[in-house]
Amino acid sequence: MNKVIAIANQKGGVGKTTTAVNLAASLAATKRKVLLIDLDPQGNATTAAGIKENATTNLYNHYFENTSIEDCVYESSDGYKIIPGGEELIALEIAIRNDNKQGFMSKSLEPISLNYDYTIIDTPPTLNQLTIEGLFCASGTLIPLQCEYYSLEGVTGLMNTIETISNKNMSS
C-alpha cells in the first residue's frame, strides 16, 4: 500500500525541501519504491534530484497538454522517482483554482500510485492551491519547523487546514 506523506509548513526556510529529499533518498536506500513530487515553483527538490529544470515535463504539462502522468516521472540520482517542480506550477495553481478542479492531483496520481511504496510531496512555502492539493493526497503530514516564535505561529493554522481538508471530499 502506498503511503503518501506531505511535507508542509507555510513558512519558508524551515527545511521542507531538505526533509522531503532526504526522506525520499533514505527510503530509496532501503529498497523502497519512492516517488517525490515537487510542488514548489522554486523547484529545489527537482534540482537536488539531479534533474535539469528546463528539460522536464511536470504536472503543468499533464494539466494543460494532457501529457500522461507516467511521462512526468523522472529517475533521480539517488534512486527515487520524481515529478519535477518549476515556475510553470504558478500557472497550474491559478488554473486549478479558477477552473474549480480541486482534487486534480489526487485523480492524476491514481494510475501510478500502486507503483510506489511511498509518495513524498514537497509543498511550497505558502498555503495556496498546490499545498492544498498535496495535503489532500496525503495520508499523513510532516511539519518541519524551527524552534522560534514565527515558525511555531503558523502551525496551528496549518493543522486547522489539514483537519478541514480531511473532513471534505475535494474530488466531487
Feature map (PLM): residue ranges:
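P-loop NTP-binding core
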Residues: 1-172
